[in-house]
């Protein structure tokens, strides 16, 4: 799984906007499965991978569809901790009193929290769950290093 920083880097695809394609929310349904184009139209559950446009790096489904676990423990502001190795030990590492929750990114197709809204799927949106949380709106993404 990617770290939180790796996930956001891939989701932004080099952009500093809310979404990899810019800030124009009217384009969002071209890139994401949200509540507005699933539940509100009578569709339930995750959609087929690659059913929406990829970002400019060719990555699909980073916005909506299912939220994705990342390696990090949840901290309210993760930027100071990006390079702290003990926050990147994977879901099976023991939680501790300081960081008992895990991070989930990307938003989802449905209404768990605000995950199915334009705000809920933006690149910087973060969710926190216990490591044993199970939901049909949470999944994971495999990641790999790209040889230089």
Residue ranges and their predicted role:
Residues 1-29, 69:
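Short, well-ordered surface patches within globular domains
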Residues 1-2, 54, 131:
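Proline-centered helix-kink/hinge sites
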Residues 7, 33, 57, 67-69, ...:
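Signature tryptophan residues that serve as conserved aromatic anchors
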Residues 15-16, 63-148:
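Surface-exposed recognition segments
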Residues 26-27, 42-45, 52, 97-99, ...:
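Short, solvent-exposed coil/turn segments
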Residues 30-63, 79:
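Short, well-ordered junction/capping motifs at the entry into regular secondary structure
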